[in-house]
Amino acid sequence: MVPPSAASIDRFIDGVWIEDGLAALTLAAYRRDLSLYAAWLQAEHGLVLDQSSEAHLLGFMQQRHASSRATTANRRLTVFKRYFRWALRENIVRADPTVRLLAARQPLRVPKTLSEAQVEALLAAPDASTPRGLRDKAMMELMYASGLRVTELVQSRTVHLGLDEGVLQVQGKGARERLVPFGEEAHAWLQRYLLQARPQILAGQSSDDLFVTRHAKGMSRQMFWNLIKRYALAAGIQVPLSPHTLRHAFATHLLNHGADLRAVQMLLGHADIGTTTIYTHVARERLRQLHAKHHPRA
């Protein structure tokens, strides 16, 4: 028999997937957070998820997040709020215990990014005379040219690529589709990869994935992250990096060169322009640095 909490979580996950078309990774995170709380509630109080009170939720959050970052606590609270709103709508609970729970204040987290010179050094690091190096070069050029998320990059298929048009069809968060353009430099490297490197890597095998490994499968997020770290080391880049370093650089450099914020929002696939606004802080900080360095009265 399926435990009551697990059954409720399953129904909720199915519901939000149908309603919003959330990505598999997001659904997995929802399930993980709710299952963790349900297990705690059962162990500490002998209750199931739908018997939660505000006090129970506060106790869990205080116990689990006493020393963690506000962003982690807020993400989990968002999941709980969404679950109990759904449970109330479905008449599973009589009241929403999260109504009075407020998100913790958190500092503005500005994305780590690279200067244009550092990006050039990173993009020059792969040995494009080898099949794998050419593949890696094409991947990084495309990411910097289009601002793709890592998941969007590694999950791209050959049918999604419009090489002649210079666009890639992408399914982003929430199953939202968009067309992302890329420039001549990325086009040239993609063309070389498709004609020269990809057939050599596949060695007679077939694959629908755009960027392939020797096993004729797509690259994982972790594999691409390892590549970024390796090439950054080779390029002598010592600033903190993330898997989305080139995506952050794409947005910041566009804004530095006067791009419209709404246009950048569309290119990045952000549902809320508030998410894109964070990059304006990076751009302004860069302008302050340039002013301090070059203005005679700075």
What residue spans do the PLM features occupy?
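Conserved catalytic core of the tyrosine transesterase superfamily
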Residues: M1-A298
